[in-house]
Amino acid sequence: MLKPLGDRVIIEVVEKEEKTIGGIVLPDTAKEKPQQGKVVAVGTGRVTDEGKRIDLDVKENDLVIYSKYAGTEVKHDGKEYLIVRESDILAIVG
């Protein structure tokens, strides 16, 4: 499994099948980049200038919404993940 460092979070991207109003399924090339996913791992937190470690607000299994162009896409064990900084996460769903 991947282990993020510092204030980074690993997100498993949740992809929805997109259809037009007429019921046509859109190919991957025509889809918007997803902005929602499930947190699968969190780093140890960020360190302040004084050396104090601050825990992250998100936790494993949180469903989150993140910035559209955030992070680095990686493939691991056949699954697609996104590694983002916690500051790129906009909201926790639910």
From Swiss-Prot:
Subcellular location per the Swiss-Prot or TrEMBL entry: Cytoplasm
Gene3D superfamilies assigned to the protein according to its UniProt record, in alphabetical order: GroES chaperonin
Gene Ontology BP, a term: chaperone cofactor-dependent protein refolding
Top-level taxon of origin: Bacteria
GO molecular-function terms, A-Z: ATP binding; metal ion binding; protein folding chaperone; protein-folding chaperone binding; unfolded protein binding
UniProt xrefs under PROSITE patterns: CHAPERONINS_CPN10 (PS00681)
Keyword Chaperone applies: yes
Keywords: Chaperone, Cytoplasm
Assembly: Heptamer of 7 subunits arranged in a ring. Interacts with the chaperonin GroEL.
Family: Belongs to the GroES chaperonin family.
Main function: Together with the chaperonin GroEL, plays an essential role in assisting protein folding. The GroEL-GroES system forms a nano-cage that allows encapsulation of the non-native substrate proteins and provides a physical environment optimized to promote and accelerate protein folding. GroES binds to the apical surface of the GroEL ring, thereby capping the opening of the GroEL channel.
Name of the protein this chain belongs to: Co-chaperonin GroES
Species of provenance: Exiguobacterium sp. (strain ATCC BAA-1283 / AT1b)
Lineage, broadest ranks: Bacteria, Bacillati, Bacillota, Bacilli, Bacillales
